[in-house]
Swiss-Prot record:
Residues 150-190 form the LRRCT domain. PANTHER family: DYNEIN AXONEMAL LIGHT CHAIN 1, NISCHARIN RELATED. Belongs to the dynein light chain LC1-type family. One of its GO terms (cellular component) is microtubule. SUPFAM superfamilies: L domain-like (SSF52058). Expressed in tissues carrying motile cilia such as respiratory epithelia, ependyma and testis. LRR repeats lie at residues 49-70, 71-92, 94-115, 116-137. This is Dynein axonemal light chain 1. The modification N-acetylalanine is found at A2.
Amino acid sequence: MAKATTIKEALARWEEKTGQRPSEAKEIKLYAQIPPIEKMDASLSMLANCEKLSLSTNCIEKIANLNGLKNLRILSLGRNNIKNLNGLEAVGDTLEELWISYNFIEKLKGIHIMKKLKILYMSNNLVKDWAEFVKLAELPCLEDLVFVGNPLEEKHSAENNWIEEATKRVPKLKKLDGTPVIKGDEEEDN
């Protein structure tokens, strides 16, 4: 089997392709590397100006080495092998959008540190309990959530009460699974 691509190698390729220096760039795309990236290694720490980092469609198992990314606002990690949210604390004060669909996340432990997170795309993961889902209510800025394809959503959508139950537990949501959330008190006026 081919050796995994390191972040350092992927950054060197990206620099060659774009002519930009990774340490100065605001947006860096390292998605779908061949062979895939397996580790978020220490080379990420040089991305001091990066505001949007895409590492989607690789084979990353752990979120790590984000401490140097002081300006990171958007992190794209969809289609990897991530099992938990450990490692996000390093960007807890800046991250506004986390795209982490198509992974293997079952628990939302550690999400509460995301003080500025507005958008969370985490469809097609393994969250199956309300006890995990309610942790999203601890995010003061969360407005837009995509949660379709998690066992919890599938179960309640089949029972036709997903949106009602989810918005009851995370009342600040403005958009759920791509649909604007209509607040109950507005409906009562009809």
